[in-house]
Every structure is written in structure tokens, then in C-alpha cells.
Design a protein with these regions (language model features):
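Surface-exposed receptor/substrate recognition regions of extracellular proteins
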Residues: 1-362, 366-368, 372-474, 480-505, ...
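Short, glycine-/Ser/Thr-/acidic-enriched flexible segments
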Residues: 11, 32, 91, 242-244, ...
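Short, charged, low-hydrophobicity "junction" segments
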Residues: 51-59, 119, 394-425, 453-457, ...
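Surface-exposed or flexible loop/turn and strand-edge residues in extracellular/cell-surface modules
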Residues: 81, 130-132, 141, 146-148, ...
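Extended interaction regions within the primary functional domain
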Residues: 87-90, 137, 405-406, 452, ...
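Intrinsic low-complexity repeat tracts in disordered regions, enriched in small/polar residues
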Residues: 130-150, 168, 189-191, 196, ...
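Extracellular beta-rich repeat passengers
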Residues: 176, 366, 370-380, 512-517, ...
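Right-handed parallel beta-helix
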Residues: 425, 430, 439-466, 510-635
Length: 962
């Protein structure tokens, strides 16, 4: 009985048996050795022999012989019974197979056919009218095929399908031919392959009547002129060339189109040859590249800071504008993408490229130089105000469906029956013409002026007309609410911007501009639903010339614009230039953008819904009409944020870098971070929320604090002109600021000055214009809340005083400054300051020098109107856990409540302002003469601890309370 235990056994007998068998398999002479079940196993010698046999059989298969004699001479390497091939001596075959039979190569009868043989057989088939193509079932029936110049389906009675047709492999058979056709077959790009018209004309077959001829392959062409000069019968030709190569096919339906060099070629017979492609590139349209040596020279010159040499190197390079425009024209025609992912090109921006399809230019470079664009300010036409102003030069203009503009008759009807719905707070416009355009946008522009910029009534371009816009809902609903009270019956222009069928994506090249004072737009967005990605921009402009109206990305009267990833730089001295400029647009998203040194974001005359994430800008500007603006993780370096508009403004995690902008000169406005745009009446009637702010200073700055007493996070009124701009100045009704840190690591030794304040909210004037003269109100905030404010890296002998609210000495002049009537306590505004922690290393502060609440002035100036008006702005100020609380309120009526923290001063100059203090420490801080200030007659103290005054001073007065 065979020794055959179960697999997996670990008995000593099994292990010994395995060892003996392995020794025989590896070292024994036998060809095979039985396993423990009795079945033979190949030994190592047997396996090596088999491998050699296989190798010998493979050798002849890898060899090719020119003649039979050459193969016979190598018979030693062709094993007995193996086959090999030698080249046929004539055109009857490509190669002939032979076998080694007893040392002699003998023909097997098998041959590899040549192309000539295949062509001969095909010719015989054609001449006999047989099927060059057929579908054959297993039973031998051929129900479908092509013969005698026609498609046939003899065995089919009917082919049924739904209205959608049949789809297979990504292709579709549709049972509803287009108008004018009995049947037609299209290429994927829309060109007709073949078909039959209703009048019986055959297209694309041998006897076609439209001049198209048959679909015959042609030879290759060396260049486009070879196709232009071609007179043969072929309708398919291949251009062979570096970067320009591709297949061209005659379009028999097109007899009128002009050439698009590289896309549509017209031959001497008048046929139109269309490029067949899944996408096109600028190279295909013969866009001249910047030669490699020139590009290297330009890059080296720029690396050395030699801009003029770089311009000189590019002066001999041919511009690529026309080729770029042609590439997009052809892509638009066939609805295919444009891709150019390498190469460098020079553009003069003489005409714009119209973009209607997905575009990918990442990896390529577009230069502009001393002759690109124009050397003049061009903001473009203004509807109704300056309609004939020259258009700006544009490099790319992204377009979509045509807008629907209301006719004069439709405007008259709208003004009579529907314009009354365009009032602030409305989300309803029952205008029937809007109903079919659900999801689009309605835009209305009034003939009436809302604002005169800077009070200028002479220049039409300084007039801001009433306007409003919103996306269209169902049956009269509006997505965005109306924000303006447009005068009824005043609409002078209105349009519907339709919703697109898809989002268009534009991936940017690296834009490099060299010329000074050259104005143009890189990308104009003239259609909604656009994604602009991966912008890289470098400017070598100098500081000596203006760049006003220079814009990289512009969008106007559209919606759903997404700007994703950007790196843009320019010179710091340039004003009026922006990396992104948005006008009259809904729903804009800007993410991961870096726009410094003169570049920033501008919401100019109209934006609803701006969402920004992780951006770094030189400045953020809203000239007029910014509504619902939300920034997260925003860095502003060098300048500031200017606001105008309303609804809600929200900024989370804001970093401010205060630095020089031009040599050693730092502009005046750099002593504040967020301001209300003065040239538009400081009008910002919305909620302002700021959460998480860090402010830092450049160590190399000059003594910027010598000419000003504060740095203001939010400045609600500045010190500009007081001209009547046509509207009331409506400051944010609610301001909420949380978690502010002033990092003073960059402040010079011995600074800031002792009379310096770090302010949360500041007004430098009580009125934007004099109400008694202009009749224009200045409405101050109803509610101000500051929660969490301190400084770090303060020098050991310096103070850093946190000021929650700083108001002007002329507050009494604004007798209509409140939106609300006074309450029973005599106040109509609320200011709440929590957790303001000043750093006091030198406990000596002069009177009116630096305080937590700063309302200077003299009660002797108060007028009867100020005291008696129900709408004089009178705040109730609450301080919670502020250390120290320094109260300075001689200039205006106010009520002050202090809870917790540490009280250092209450000064009213005897104006009767009340103050209540609960659960606080009281440690008075004297001035340099040791004088302390505490208005004991109007200050009621409850549950507080009295500490000795700081710096060894004494308090000679009394306390009132318990």
C-alpha cells in the first residue's frame, strides 16, 4: 500500500519522505520522480530540457529571412518541425512560410498576403457588385450592408425604436431625421458623412449630386497650401507637420464660408475642407511661437531686472493675435475645446478672441509688450450716460447666449405697469416676459441719478444711476431681493440674461506684461456660468506711469462667476487697476487668489452675493452697490477695504499687513483698515460683521503715527469733502467686531506715542455733509459691539490702549443722526464693549490722550436742537470686563454702564453724563502731574473694590454708592 498520508501532516515520517523525494528531484538522474501518491513529477533536469526545447522552437519565430537560401543556411537554429518565414520574391505575397523537415526547409503552402493582393481582391469584389461590407447572421442571412454605392437592409421589414432612437457605443440611430433629410449620418463634430435629401440628392456616395463626391481617402499633404491647391477627387486628406498636422474632410454642405486658416481651408475648386479634431490648439492655426532662444533671452533679462532688454528681444517676434482668434472661431463653430498647454506667444490685443467653448491654456505663456493695448484710460461705454465711449481692448471675451433687451415699446409697458415693484425689500416682479427665462437674470437701469460721485454734476461718468438686478424665479419670484427704491416709471434700459446650458471653464495661461501704461482686459466675462481657473499673472510695469482701467478679469451684467486659484502681481504705485473687476453681477466666488502690489478686487457699481475664501489682496474696493459680501480667511497687505452698499458684510479671519507703498511714503489712508467709500457718500446701509482680526506693521515704516492719533479698524466717516452727492449717508446700522489682536512686533523703539489709540470703530466727522445746508442726513450706527481686543509684542515701557469707540468733537452738530427716536432713558443707540484689554506698562496717561471710550468736545457748544431733537444720536455705552476702562465723554450726551474689569478714569467735564459701575476694581490712572479724573457726582459705584491710584497718585474726592 502506498505511503500517502493527508496533506498538512507534520509527522516525522512525512517530513523524512519529503526530504528524500526533494533530493531525488534535484540531484537524481531520472526524468521524473513519483510523488507520495504515485503520480510522476518532473525532475530539475527534465524541466531544464523542456525549457531548452521551448527556446529552440521560439528562435526561428523571431528571425526574418530575406531569401529561402538565407533561411536554409541557418537551418541549425531552426528545430526539426518548426516553421519560419522568408520574404516573397514577388508581389503575390508579403512572406512565405516554410518548415524544417529532416533538415530541409519545405513550403507549407501558407503565405502572408500583400497590400497589392488585398487591393486586387477588393477591386474584383467592387467590379462584381458584391458586398464590400455586410452584417451576416449565424444562419447565413445578410440583412444589412453596403453594395453598389448604397446601404441596404433587404431582410428588414421594419426597425422600431422610441423617439429617442437607438444608442450603441456612444453613437445614436435616431428615427427622426432633421428637416430636409430622408436619412443622414453625421460625424461627431457635426459634419455630414453621408445621407440622402428629401429631393433624392445623395450626399457622400459615389454618384452624389452636391459636389461632395464619394468619401475617398486621399494622400498626405505637406501643408495647408497643398490642400488649397488640390484638384483631385479625394475628400479626405491628412496634413503632416509639426504641431499643425491633422485630418481635413470636405464639407459638401458648405459652399460659402470664408477661410479660417488651420480650421477651414478653401481649395481652388471652391470646396471647404474642415479640420477633424476633438480639440484645437493655437499651433494648428499657425500661431507664431516666441522662438526658444528669444524666450530664454527674455527670461534672463527679466531675472536681471532688465525690462527694456526683454521688450527689445520681443520686438522682432510676430504677434499671434490672429491665429488665437481663428482657433477660437473654429472651436466655436464645431463646439470643441481649445487646448494649448505649452509654448510662448506675443499678443498685441488688437482684436479680441471670442471664447464660447472650454479653454485650457495652462502651461503656455502670453506676453504683452510696449505696443499691446492702448496708452489711455478706457473703462468702456456707460449705458444711458456715455454710450459712445471707446470699448477697452480685450484679449479674450467669453460669450454665450444673446441677451434679450427690452424694446422701447416693452420699456414703456414695463414703466407703466411693473416698475413700481422695483422697491427695496421686494422679491416679486410679475412681469410676464420674465417667466420663460426661469433661472436667468433680469437687469434694470434707471434714467434717474442716485449718486453724484464726489458731488460732481458735470461729468456724466461721475453719475451713478439707479439700478437693480436679480435672478429670475418662477411666476414673478425673484431670487435676490431688490435693494434700491428705483423711481417708478424711470427705467431706461432693461435686459434678460438667459441661463446657459452648461458652465464654461477657462484655464488661464501665464500672462506676462512688459509695456508701461498699456491698458487692456485679459479676460472679459460676458456670459453667465463661467469658471476661470489657475490665473498666473506677472507685470513688469514701472512706477512712473498710471495704469488706471487696467483689469485682468472683468465681468459685467452676468451671474455665477467662479474664479479659482490666481497668482497676480503688479507695481505698488498703480491706482485704478484691478485683478478682478465685477459690475452688476450676481453670485461671484473668488477662492485662493493672491493679488498684490497694485492689484486687488473691485466691485464696481453693482454686485450681489460675493463669496471669497483664502485670498490675499492689495485692496478690496466697492465703488458703489455691494450687497451680501462674505470673505473668509482674507489677507490685505498695503492698503484697505472700502465698502459701499448694504444687506450684509461678513469678514472672518482677517489679516492686515500695514506696509509702505511707495518708497518711504505711506499714504494717509493706511491708518485704517475698513472704510466707507467717501466718494460715494460713505453710504453703506448694511450689517457689518468682523470676526478674527490680526493687524501687523512693517518694521521699516517711517513714524506713521506722528500725524495721527489712532489706527482704526473700521472708519465709518473720514475727513474728505462735504459736497452734496445726492443721497443720505447711511452708515452700517449694526457693527459687530470680535477678537482683534494688534501685533506690535514691527513698531520702532519707543513707539507708539503715549497719546495713541488702537480703535475698533472711529468717525472723524459727525456728518458727511452739513444737514442744515444740503438736507442730507448722516445716519450713524444703531448698534456697535466689540468683543475681544488687545495687543501683543508691546515694548516694555510703552502703552497700547484699546479704544472701542472714537467719535468727533462735533457730534452735537448731527441732530438727525439716529434712525430711532430717543427712549425713556434719553438714548437711541447701543455700544457694547467687552473684554478690551489694554497693555499699560507706563501707568501715566494725559487727559484726552488715549481712552477706551473717546468722545471729545465741550458741552458749551451743545445747541438746543441737539438737546431736544428726538433723533440726535445719543448712545448707551456698556463696558464689560474692560481692563482698564478709560471713559472720556465731555463732547456728547451719553449714558455709561461698567461691569467688572478695572476702571481707571471717568471724565465728563461736568456735562451731566451718568455712569454706573458694578463689580469692578477701581484703580485710577493719573496724568504726568499726578492728577486723577473721576466724575464722582454722576458716577454710582456698587460692589466695587477701591485700589490705590497708580503711580503713587492720590484721589482727593469721594465715592458715591455702596
Amino acid at each position: 500500500m502506498a505511503f500517502n498520508p493527508e496533506l498538512g501532516s507534520t509527522s516525522p515520517a512525512v517530513l523524512l519522505d519529503n526530504a528524500e523525494r526533494l533530493d531525488k528531484l534535484v540531484n537524481g538522474p531520472a526524468a521524473d520522480v513519483p510523488d507520495r501518491g504515485g503520480d510522476p513529477l518532473y525532475s530539475w533536469r527534465q524541466m531544464m530540457a523542456k525549457n531548452d526545447e521551448i527556446r529552440q522552437n521560439i528562435i526561428p519565430l523571431s528571425k526574418q529571412y530575406a531569401t529561402l537560401a538565407a533561411a536554409q543556411a541557418d537551418i541549425a537554429n531552426i528545430p526539426e518541425g518548426s516553421t519560419t518565414y522568408y520574404r516573397s520574391p514577388d508581389d503575390s505575397a508579403l512572406a512565405i512560410e516554410v518548415m524544417n523537415v529532416g533538415g530541409t526547409l519545405t513550403a507549407t503552402g501558407r503565405k502572408m498576403p500583400s497590400s497589392q493582393a488585398v487591393d486586387s481582391v477588393r477591386g474584383l469584389i467592387d467590379s462584381q457588385g458584391e458586398n464590400p461590407f455586410s452584417v451576416v447572421f449565424k444562419n447565413g442571412l445578410s440583412p444589412f450592408g453596403y453594395k453598389d454605392g448604397r446601404l441596404y437592409a433587404d431582410e428588414f421589414q421594419k426597425l422600431y425604436s422610441s423617439d429617442a432612437g437607438l444608442e450603441f457605443g456612444g453613437s445614436i440611430i435616431d428615427n427622426n431625421p432633421p428637416d430636409g433629410w430622408r436619412f443622414v449620418i453625421y460625424y461627431r463634430n457635426g459634419l455630414v458623412m453621408c445621407g440622402q435629401r428629401n429631393d433624392g440628392t445623395m450626399i457622400g456616395f459615389g454618384e452624389g449630386g452636391s459636389g461632395g463626391g464619394s468619401i475617398e481617402p486621399g494622400d498626405t499633404a505637406a501643408d495647408y497650401d497643398s490642400i488649397r491647391n488640390y484638384t483631385g477627387t479625394a475628400t479626405v486628406r491628412d496634413v503632416v507637420g509639426q504641431r499643425t498636422g491633422g485630418r481635413f474632410v470636405v464639407n459638401p454642405d458648405d459652399t460659402t464660408s470664408g477661410e479660417i486658416p488651420g480650421g477651414i481651408l478653401v481649395d481652388v475648386l471652391g470646396r471647404r475642407w474642415y479640420r477633424q479634431a476633438e480639440f484645437v490648439s493655437y499651433d494648428m492655426f499657425m500661431a507664431p511661437r516666441v522662438p526658444g532662444a528669444t524666450l530664454l533671452a527674455v527670461q534672463v533679462a527679466l531675472a536681471m531686472g532688465n525690462r527694456s532688454s526683454a521688450i527689445a528681444y520681443l520686438s522682432g517676434v510676430e504677434a499671434a493675435d490672429a491665429a488665437i482668434q481663428n482657433a477660437h472661431r473654429y472651436a466655436n463653430l464645431l463646439n470643441i475645446p481649445v487646448r494649448q498647454n505649452d509654448g510662448a506667444f506675443l499678443v498685441l490685443v488688437d482684436h479680441e478672441a471670442e471664447v464660447r467653448t472650454k479653454t485650457s491654456l495652462g502651461g503656455s505663456i502670453i506676453f504683452t509688450s510696449a505696443d499691446s493695448g492702448v496708452n489711455e484710460i478706457r473703462w468702456g461705454p456707460l449705458r444711458l450716460l456715455d454710450p459712445t465711449a471707446p470699448e477697452p481692448k480685450r484679449m479674450f471675451n467669453i460669450k454665450g447666449k444673446e441677451r434679450i433687451e427690452l424694446t422701447p415699446a416693452e420699456l414703456a409697458t414695463f414703466n407703466t405697469s411693473y416698475s413700481q415693484y422695483l422697491k427695496k425689500g421686494s422679491n416679486y416682479l410679475p412681469y410676464p416676459k420674465l417667466y420663460p427665462y426661469y433661472g436667468g437674470m433680469f437687469y434694470a437701469l434707471s434714467n434717474e441719478v442716485e449718486i453724484y460721485r464726489n458731488g460732481n454734476r458735470d461729468n456724466p461718468r461721475d453719475r451713478v444711476l439707479y439700478r437693480d438686478f436679480s435672478r429670475i424665479g418662477r411666476n414673478g419670484a425673484l431670487t435676490e431681493r431688490i435693494v434700491k427704491d428705483i423711481p417708478t416709471g424711470s427705467i431706461g434700459y432693461a435686459a434678460i440674461i438667459p441661463k446657459e446650458d452648461d458652465f464654461l471653464e477657462f484655464e488661464c495661461p501665464h500672462f506676462i506684461e512688459l509695456g508701461d501704461s498699456r491698458r487692456f482686459l485679459n479676460i472679459e466675462v460676458s456670459r453667465p456660468m463661467v469658471r476661470i481657473k489657475n490665473l498666473v499673472h506677472t507685470s513688469w510695469q514701472t512706477a512712473s506711469t498710471s495704469l488706471e482701467s487696467r483689469v485682468v478679469i472683468s465681468a459685467r451684467e452676468v451671474f455665477d462667476v467662479f474664479c479659482e486659484y490666481g497668482e497676480t502681481t503688479c507695481h505698488p504705485a498703480e491706482n485704478g487697476s484691478y485683478v478682478i473687476c465685477i459690475r452688476d453681477t450676481c453670485n461671484v466666488h473668488i477662492d485662493n487668489y493672491y493679488g498684490l502690489h497694485g492689484w486687488g478686487f473691485q466691485g464696481h457699481h453693482g454686485i450681489k452675493g460675493l463669496y471669497g475664501n483664502r485670498n490675499t489682496f492689495n485692496r478690496v474696493d466697492f465703488h458703489s452697490f455691494g450687497y451680501d459680501v462674505f470673505f473668509k480667511d482674507l489677507t490685505v497687505k498695503g492698503r484697505q477695504i472700502n465698502l459701499q452698499g448694504g444687506n450684509e458684510w461678513s469678514i472672518e479671519k482677517l489679516r492686515l499687513y500695514i506696509t509702505r507703498t511707495s518708497g518711504d511714503a505711506v499714504e494717509y489712508f493706511l491708518n485704517y483698515a475698513i472704510g466707507m467709500r467717501q466718494d460715494y457718500a460713505s453710504d453703506c446701509d448694511g450689517i457689518l460683521n468682523i470676526d478674527g482680526v490680526t493687524v501687523m506693521w512693517d518694521r521699516g515704516l517711517p513714524a506713521w503715527y506722528n500725524t495721527t492719533r489712532s489706527f482704526d479698524l473700521v472708519r465709518i466717516i473720514d475727513s474728505a469733502n462735504s459736497l452734496d452727492q445726492g443721497i443720505d449717508s447711511k452708515l452700517p446700522p449694526t457693527i459687530t467686531i470680535r477678537n482683534i489682536v494688534f501685533d506690535l512686533a514691527g513698531i520702532q523703539t519707543g513707539r507708539p506715542n503715549d497719546n495713541f489709540e488702537f480703535c475698533a470703530v472711529t468717525a472723524l466727522r459727525s456728518q458727511f455733509t452739513d444737514y442744515a445746508v444740503t438736507g442730507r442726513k448722516t445716519l450713524l450706527p444703531d448698534n456697535i459691539t466689540v468683543d475681544g481686543m488687545t495687543a501683543i509684542n508691546v515694548q516694555p515701557i510703552q502703552n497700547a490702549v484699546m479704544c472701542g469707540i472714537k467719535l468727533p468733537a462735533d457730534l452735537y452738530q448731527n441732530t438727525v443722526g439716529s434712525r430711532n427716536k430717543k427712549g425713556s432713558d434719553g438714548t437711541n443707540a447701543r455700544i457694547t464693549l467687552r473684554n478690551l484689554h489694554s497693555v499699560i506698562n507706563n501707568p501715566s496717561i494725559e487727559l484726552a490722550a488715549a481712552q477706551t471710550v473717546d468722545i471729545p468736545g465741550d458741552a458749551a457748544n451743545w445747541t438746543t436742537d441737539y438737546l431736544n431733537s428726538d433723533y440726535s444720536w445719543i448712545p448707551r455705552i456698556t463696558l464689560d470686563n474692560c481692563i482698564p476702562a478709560i471713559i472720556h465723554t465731555p463732547g456728547a450726551k451719553a449714558v455709561v454702564d461698567i461691569h467688572g474689569g478695572k476702571l481707571a478714569r471717568v471724565y465728563t467735564n461736568g456735562n451731566g453724563n451718568r455712569c454706573r459701575v458694578t463689580s469692578a476694581d477701581i484703580e485710577l490712572i493719573p496724568d504726568a502731574s499726578g492728577v486723577t479724573y473721576f466724575a464722582a457726582d454722576k458716577t454710582l459705584v456698587t460692589g466695587c473694590s477701591w485700589l490705590n491710584p497708580a503711580s503713587g497718585a492720590t484721589y482727593p474726592g469721594t465715592l458715591r454708592g455702596s
